[in-house]
């Protein structure tokens, strides 16, 4: 092999390594979550405590039709994890760098979602595995396009289904829950984030 070819091959190998490293370092995108909320008319909250109050009011049905979301970093992100995502202390204590959460509840539809970015990959892995283990009897797991997933579809009645999906990509988690009679809503949300829908479970 002549010198030119050796140099060309070296650059190609380097490009592959760099490309793979870039792919491996990607996490779920908070900007996508914020755009989804803006497009769907969710009310933005700046303060994690105010958002937690709104979340609790919406989830028990005191504010039918309301939509709320928050995007927070550092201490605010930690507060979102502690007081909203992990409000029942079902998951371990984790150090969170960035968090986006959204919720919508009306008579016949319920939607909640989270994008969480942690200090370390081990936190994301722990939460993903805990959730999958807890609901392994009625879910399906796998890997696709650089992320792991665990999805569930449960029929409550002819007029209501529960769709849940948790997705891990490196040190980040995406969680989506949707209660609705049709798969179209959760399918649309998952398409926005580029992940497999729980309706495929």
Residue ranges and their predicted role:
Residues 1-11:
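Bacterial N-terminal signal peptides that target proteins for export
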Residues 19-22:
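C-terminal motif of bacterial Sec signal peptides marking the signal peptidase cleavage site
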Residues 24-26:
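Bacterial signal peptide processing site
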Residues 38-60, 79, 135-145, 194-200:
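Short secondary-structure junctions
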Residues 44-111, 123-127, 152-155:
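Short, compositionally biased low-complexity segments enriched in polar/charged residues
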Residues 121-170, 185-201:
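Short Gly/Thr-rich strand-loop-strand
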Residues 167, 171-179:
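Short, well-ordered beta-strand elements
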Residues 176-188:
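A short acidic/glycine-rich loop-to-helix N-cap element
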